[in-house]
Amino acid sequence: MKRLFLAIVAVIVAFTAVDAKPKQLKPWSKGTLDIHHISTGRGSTIFYILPDGTRLLVDAGDLGDPSRWTHKEIMPAVPNGDKTPAEWIARYIEHFSKPLDKELYLDYAMISHFDADHYGKLDKTAITVEGKPYKYTGMTHLANLIPIHTLIDRGYPNYDYPTAEAFRKRNGKLFFNYYELVKEREAKGLKMEQFKVGSDKQFALKSDAAAYPSFRIQNVAGNGNIWTGKGNETRSVIGPKAPQGAALNENSSSCVFRLEYGNFSYYMGGDISGFYSKKKNNYWLDVQTPVSKVIGTVDVAVADHHGYRDSMNDALLKALNANAIVLPVWDLYHPHPSTMKRINKQGVTEVFPAGMTAENLAKLTDQGLADAIRPAGHIVVRVLNGGKKYQIFVLNDRSLDYEIIYKSKVFTARGNK
């Protein structure tokens, strides 16, 4: 109880670092890059407003019925449980899209990989809708709240990694629910694409690309393949010496990319793993190490696999050398103490949780691992026009006013290497 009290006090003290009168984030303006790590308490979602106003969403998680956890294992749904995660995500996107002064839609939406906390859960919370061949949950729900011009995932159109049979067995009914949305989009002539490993053109700016030539998203890994670092060239993550039948699991099949704007750079790697069983010698499950060889340094990184024990191995942390790390977390087990030890050892000074249970914060505080952890909430990385400076804001995820509860110093972006 004492640890929990101290952790809560630490959060309250951090809140007071911002002016006593709550302030809202200044509206997006042309030339600014905003990256919103949305906290719902029920899964991962990242919303990007790119410098010309192009909009990208990565994931729309929904863990479904929370009753299978104890109250201490998972944080409350935020801002509350009155709406589904997809409805709260849609409201957030609508709110922060107002400065664009145009129709509400997403130019791109991508599912990093096929796990419930990234694209929905098929249980009693999934919504049956008359006339629809699929239930609404996560991305299938969001796609019916906000039009998506191009929907991207790791497997379209064949969904056959590691094999078609293994893919379907692994992902089951939840995938087939999503696949009905895919077929509906195809019938309507709406764009579907596979994440193109090696490409830096897939997420092109849609409104005024010529004005921002330094902006690009480099697709690094996904669906069993990885960029070599040369042109659009790719190779299999699993080398030729691996035993026959060796394959990545769903997490390590995640889509991975590097975003650049001016001198600023940012890493997103889904749930790829950085560890493997030495007893089984299944070394190919460590995707972080090969990624570390081509990714380059960044200013801000999203922790892979929510900061779990297999997240952010030493090779990747050293290669990224990030100033700040964002943690998409919501339960007692993420981030894991071993991961926080590695992050602290690397010298990362600011760690931003998009959600956090008070119990886990207390545990990490008690172990001396929470010094770099900032208040939890919606985490917004704002990159100023031209990409030379950036600042990180924490917005209140319990409020529909999205007040600023913490703000970092203004960082100087370090340049792309």
Label for each model-derived stretch:
Residues K2-I8:
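Sec-dependent signal peptide recognition
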